[in-house]
């Protein structure tokens, strides 16, 4: 069930090769995923589930594996990292001398274990670090004031919710963007969630919970939203909807985003900047394709 949602490309390919080897030794493998193109060189059969019916796909198509994640050259910064060192146990995970992150939509990539989630937690003061982080030239400190400016979308939607009832969760929102109500109504209608708001989140699918989580976070008035694997459990239509909302927030409200994702297709030609974590530090990637 979406086995590679949080797995980097290199590791994913190694695991797929292992699965194929198991298959060659007589093990039947059934995979449920929103990215069928990952399995074109491995799977024998593709089926599509829609409205309670299974349909055999006779000609699964391949998508362009290359995505463009850097589409902007503006220089207005939102974050500056100065002499940052982050430890994971006794291991130094990140060491950054001086690095700027710009306003807009930034995609943050890197292999598993390189520190992507840890960096987001450091920015939001949920992880200890040495050094200084500046937000709009003001040193970041853990405070209530900070969380009115920076918010974080956690990987596990359940960890984000205060209430188990979606209607209650939505009603708790106070300071939201003027255009957010319209987008909330659109999301609930397009994904058939209008009649589900009084059901416990325990009865929601992973994708439905993720949509409610993102709906609440994208509605809130914050200058910077940190998104950790926001496309997990979402189908292509849902990913496109969320990216349209993100772009609308950027256009109408000037909101900025740092998005950690191993699923890059939704960000193709929509991401302004691409930052990669490798060799324990940060790098701006300016090539057209990734």
Located regions from the model:
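Conserved ABC ATPase signature
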Residues: 200-204, 208
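Conserved ABC transporter NBD signature motif
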Residues: 128-146
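ABC-family nucleotide-binding domains
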Residues: 8, 235
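Catalytic Walker B motif of ABC-type/P-loop ATPase nucleotide-binding domains
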Residues: 1-2, 225-229
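H-loop/switch region of ABC-family ATPase nucleotide-binding domains
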Residues: 32-34, 260-262
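Helix-to-loop junction immediately C-terminal to a conserved catalytic motif
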Residues: 124
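Conserved ABC ATPase "signature" region
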Residues: 179-196, 215
């Amino acid at each position: 069930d979406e086995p590679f949602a949080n797995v980097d490309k290199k590791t994913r390919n190694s695991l797929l090769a292992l699965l194929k080897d198991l298959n060659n030794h007589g093990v039947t493998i059934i995979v449920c995923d929103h990215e069928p193109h990952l399995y074109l060189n491995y799977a024998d059969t593709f089926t599509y589930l829609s409205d309670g019916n299974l349909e055999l796909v006779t000609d699964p198509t391949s998508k362009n594996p290359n995505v463009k994640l850097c589409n902007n050259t503006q220089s207005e910064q939102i974050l500056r990292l100065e002499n940052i060192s982050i430890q994971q146990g006794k291991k130094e995970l990140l060491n950054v001398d001086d690095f700027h992150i710009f306003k807009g939509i930034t995609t943050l990539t890197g292999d598993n274990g390189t520190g992507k989630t840890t960096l987001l937690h450091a920015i939001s003061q949920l992880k200890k670090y040495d050094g200084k982080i500046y937000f709009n030239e003001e040193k970041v400190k853990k405070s209530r004031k900070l969380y009115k400016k920076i918010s974080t979308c956690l990987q596990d939607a359940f960890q984000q919710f205060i209430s188990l009832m979606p209607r209650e969760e939505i009603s708790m929102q106070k300071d939201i963007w003027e255009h957010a109500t319209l987008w909330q109504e659109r999301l609930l209608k397009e994904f058939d969630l209008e009649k589900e708001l009084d059901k416990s989140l325990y009865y929601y699918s992973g994708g439905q919970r993720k949509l409610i989580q993102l709906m609440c976070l994208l509605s809130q008035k914050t200058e910077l939203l940190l998104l950790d694997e926001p496309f997990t459990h979402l189908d292509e239509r849902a990913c496109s909807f969320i990216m349209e909302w993100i772009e609308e927030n950027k256009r109408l409200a000037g909101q900025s985003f740092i998005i950690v994702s191993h699923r890059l297709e939704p960000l193709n030609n929509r991401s302004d900047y691409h930052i990669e974590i490798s060799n324990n530090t940060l790098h701006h990637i300016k090539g057209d394709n990734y």
